[in-house]
């Protein structure tokens, strides 16, 4: 009797690394000459980051700094979903950045369809905000991982619980 192997596909990020990236971004913003007087603030909520700054120019610079610091901390830039820019009081601009965590049902269906179309001996099932993939051969599972890494999904994918 051959046992089956499996792994889970999830979309997650390390919150502590995000906190560190935001902290480093705030330090750089306070030290940079072009952003020193912009009175910029980055506020981390449960699943959002609020950027409050003086102008569109400084908002673009904050985007660059935040993305650079996140990339250096090994965070995928796909976790950031930049919302629309709103005007705030006192000629300031504000932007909400949603943090993407978990795989939506729509994207989970795309992943399972891709797996079922290309790998006949592999089973996949949606379990909440994760996708469980199982097969008899570990080589097939590794082929699935390589195929999913090659595909460009709108969220970062991690492979966990490899058994």
Curated annotation (Swiss-Prot):
InterPro entries: DUF520, UPF0234-like_C, UPF0234_N, YajQ-like_sf. The keyword Transcription does not apply. GO terms for cellular component: cytosol. SUPFAM superfamilies: YajQ-like. It holds the Pfam family DUF520. Keywords: Nucleotide-binding. One of its GO terms (molecular function) is nucleotide binding. Nucleotide-binding protein. Belongs to the YajQ family. This is Nucleotide-binding protein Tery_2743. The lineage of its organism: Bacteria, Bacillati, Cyanobacteriota, Cyanophyceae, Oscillatoriophycideae.
């Amino acid at each position: 009797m051959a046992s089956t192997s499996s792994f889970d596909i999830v979309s997650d990020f390390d919150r502590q690394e995000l906190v560190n990236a935001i902290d480093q971004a705030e330090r750089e913003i306070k030290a940079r000459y072009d952003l020193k007087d912009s009175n910029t603030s980055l506020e981390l909520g449960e699943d959002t980051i609020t950027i409050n700054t003086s102008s569109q120019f400084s908002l673009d610079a904050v985007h660059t700094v935040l993305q650079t610091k996140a990339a250096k901390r090994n965070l995928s830039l796909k976790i950031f979903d930049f919302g629309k820019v709103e005007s705030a009081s006192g000629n300031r601009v504000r932007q909400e950045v949603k943090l993407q965590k978990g795989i939506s049902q729509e994207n989970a269906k795309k992943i399972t369809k891709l797996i079922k179309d290309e790998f006949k001996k592999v089973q996949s099932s949606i379990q909440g905000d994760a996708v469980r993939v199982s097969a008899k051969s570990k080589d097939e599972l590794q082929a699935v991982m390589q195929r999913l890494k090659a595909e460009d999904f709108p969220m970062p994918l991690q492979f966990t619980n490899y058994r």
